[in-house]
Amino acid sequence: MATPHLYHRYNSKSSNKNINSSGNSTEVDRFIPKSVSRNAYKSIPMLNGFDISYSELCEKSPSPERLSSPEFFNELRNTGHYESISTTNEFSMSSISSSSESQVTRSGSARASRNDYSKLTKEQKDHRKNIAHSLGFQLPDRVFTFETTSAEILEKNKAIKNCFGPGSCAEIRSTFDFSTLSPDVARYYIANSNARSASPQRQIQRPAKRVKSHIPYRVLDAPCLRNDFYSNLISWSRTTNNVLVGLGCSVYIWSEKEGAVSILDHQYLSEKRDLVTCVSFCPYNTYFIVGTKFGRILLYDQKEFFHSSNTNEKEPVFVFQTESFKGICCLEWFKPGEICKFYVGEENGNVSLFEIKSLHFPIKNWSKRQKLEDENLIGLKLHSTYQAQAQQVCGISLNEHANLLAVGGNDNSCSLWDISDLDKPIKKFVLPHKAAVKAIAFCPWSKSLLATGGGSKDRCIKFWHTSTGTLLDEICTSGQVTSLIWSLRHKQIVATFGFGDTKNPVLITLYSYPKLSKLLEVRSPNPLRVLSAVISPSSMAICVATNDETIRFYELWNDKEEIINEIQESGIYGSNIIEYMEGIETTHNKRIR
């Protein structure tokens, strides 16, 4: 037998004739499959309600050689379940099942099959049933029906099809009796129902509790962004929603309306052989600070660049030079008060407190207008300085009440200071790590909870009770912890990572607290490194600086949840004694001895 033609889709309005190589017209057989194989045999459209008692199945299974032989297709025509469609036949169920000659042949064959089937033992019947199920004769998605099916089969097929409909598959699986089916068919139905229940359409209908995104919603180019773990070169303004970026010797502000605006020209610091190491917006006004490698602190006002008519003068409002000439690594602002204050951490381990104050220069013979302008001048005043770490200060953080200061250093520790008296700070605890500590964050909704993260030789996030210095919990990560940010709306914390797994690098991980389970991971196909990160003014997104000279924005939360002021519930500190000290009532009545 020659190799069969590929099957064609039936069209009652077009001719089914085909011209062979000799020029003669031949009838196209629609039901001959594409290839002679077991898969082709299984894909043949069979009866929707095929009953194995009417089939001419052999008591012994056919050999693989028979399935792959051309004679198999000749014998398939005589089984009574296969009929070619000629050009004279109309495509209807009545015409297919009403060919008189083939009808008699199939009827006689079916009656003989019934008589033979009634003589079979139970084991032989089960064997035939399993063979029919394995070949797919009773799958519910048949295309053609050549003979009338019984009511019992129709009810069973209806129940199975309902499982794949819009209803709940879990409810149908609980009510449908799969013991009446063979193991292969039961597995088929369950697998398809599970796939249906886990389809994207059903997942879209489920309301999401938070926005999960594995890709940034905005990426900004940042050429000359220094790949430095100890620098903090991005800041996000809470008052103007602008982003401040330090690029080498230059500083830029990016806004959605104006785009990138140059703040500090490259020439200003390059002539002094200096560069930018730290930038920070004041959280409650328009001031911002730029720190440099040689201890310069530059004070700017955003109004001078966006609300002033003279935008060509890009000079800082005030410049302060430290006596140590050491680099400014990090900066932390106090809460709003009568005086605008902030701490800076330096390369020599010092922590200095600065104030922004008005400057008055009463000079004679000045006009009234000039005198009023000079009275509005502002400047920086050094309040106090003390040695906080033995080596370079890497990170710094203030608690909510501004009476505790956490300082992370390159000496593999974080020191906790009581600054109730700003003139006489007292060291309370030294919190150890195995590498430099840059990532430090006080919890905004649990006042005595502090999180710290270690460098590349530590790679651990630790949680401390600040009143006692107790280590509450810790979790090991896959990379160098470069920043920690608490969520203001959820009991969650975000960690960003630097050096870590080069084959499968993780940039960001969102953890729940206190369970510390991973809720979201942002991975990168390339070995990227996050240098630092800041939270958005809306507390829904974070902005990260990476070593590929880009600034990336990730949305992690939504604004449906309200900002949490304070949480006083059991489990936050993981200790009954500490929770008792914090005034948290436990759900169980246990005596503390």
UniProtKB/Swiss-Prot annotation:
Interacts with CDC16. Keywords: Cell cycle, Cell division, Meiosis, Repeat, WD repeat. This is Meiosis-specific APC/C activator protein AMA1. The gene is AMA1. Activator protein that regulates the ubiquitin ligase activity and substrate specificity of the anaphase promoting complex/cyclosome (APC/C). Required for the ubiquitination and subsequent degradation of the B-type cyclin CLB1 by the APC/C complex during meiosis. Required for meiosis I, late meiotic gene expression and spore wall assembly. InterPro entries: Cdc20/Fizzy (IPR033010), WD40/YVTN_repeat-like_dom_sf (IPR015943), WD40_CDC20-Fz (IPR056150), WD40_repeat_dom_sf (IPR036322), WD40_rpt (IPR001680). WD repeats lie at residues 226-264, 271-310, 323-364, 388-427, 432-474, 525-564. Residues 113-125 have a biased composition (Basic and acidic residues). Residues 1-11 have a biased composition (Basic residues). PANTHER family: CELL DIVISION CYCLE 20 CDC20 FIZZY -RELATED, MEIOSIS-SPECIFIC APC_C ACTIVATOR PROTEIN AMA1. One of its GO terms (biological process) is positive regulation of ascospore-type prospore membrane formation.
